[in-house]
């Protein structure tokens, strides 16, 4: 899957490999992201998250979940990549930025986002090398760049390990000598290896290499490269200012021009694997109240009765398996959801007035079924009733009385509820939202390779 970025748009492009064709689905990026319609300086990918650096700062997003978080860049610092400390049990994502300080020293800042507070630490590193490109590759939490030695001009892969917070030369590249005019690209191959592409500036010929074995931060000296393919480009051909999807299958070759989807010179492409990894600390609390309501608690994903109470978010799972609902004489005042993830059942916290909860009053969701919509009513102060519509057409019992404005929360066709969030005051539920999975299009990859455009 390929990510291709274009101003304020994100487009999923479905590519049929059997009958060469594309189908485009376009969505707008949220307008509250500073610099979203400007020039994308850098676009990166890290374990399901896309990170883009504009002139105004850095955005971290999940295109499938349509979650984005924003951090302002440090003045005069250059974004170099995002990763995490792989020695810790949980992935605490970190942003690496640097600023040349002298001919032999670079200043750096590592920003960790595990809470609503952004934590930055200053560092200084001695160096006798430089980046060939600002683009990094994140693999198993570590960062890798194509770099060159200033004295010898030898090009190699430089690494940064967030667990030790150290730079280390990782391995040499197949083409040892650096030609700065050539185009080059380092990428992840088959999930755990590297691929390296280099295009000769004069001949336009392309060579692609891949590593033979899995990449680990500690085994750089053992890396072996093998040549995957060579592409000879005729002298009369020009690949400049031309965006295409090429489909090669057996002895068949097809070219689909997509210039209308990407703009020169602002197009950037990155390999991306769709994921349900949420953007870290996606609570919106660092934005204004108006923006928070617009982004989380507006249909069709969420509803807000009032802004009272404490915000909660159960997170994202694979499915919902059981629901506990509590009511008083009139209204729905308590919910608790039980989720499945990796063949395990995980119980979320209870939300609302737990004294109304009857342990025998629970909704069981049969295997193969899922919640496709949540419906109910609300007043100006709280949610009054709630029910759940299942994929197989069943409507669960209504909890609470029908009182106030009706609401219906649902995802795209084929999406299922995989998590809940909201606000509760201890007496009432004041807001409710649903994390929906991406539509099945993004999971049907046997003969299709979607492409995303920003």
From Swiss-Prot:
UniProt entry keywords in alphabetical sequence: Lectin
GO molecular function: carbohydrate binding
InterPro entries xref list: F-box-assoc_dom_typ1, F-box-assoc_interact_dom, Jacalin-like_lectin_dom, Jacalin-like_lectin_dom_sf
Gene3D superfamilies for the chain: Jacalin-like lectin domain
UniProt KW Oxidoreductase keyword: no
Annotated Pfam families: FBA_1, Jacalin
Keyword Transmembrane: no
Domain Jacalin-type lectin intervals: 295-438
Source organism superkingdom: Eukaryota
Family as reported in the entry's similarity comment: Belongs to the jacalin lectin family.
Protein name: Jacalin-related lectin 37
Organism per entry: Arabidopsis thaliana (Mouse-ear cress)
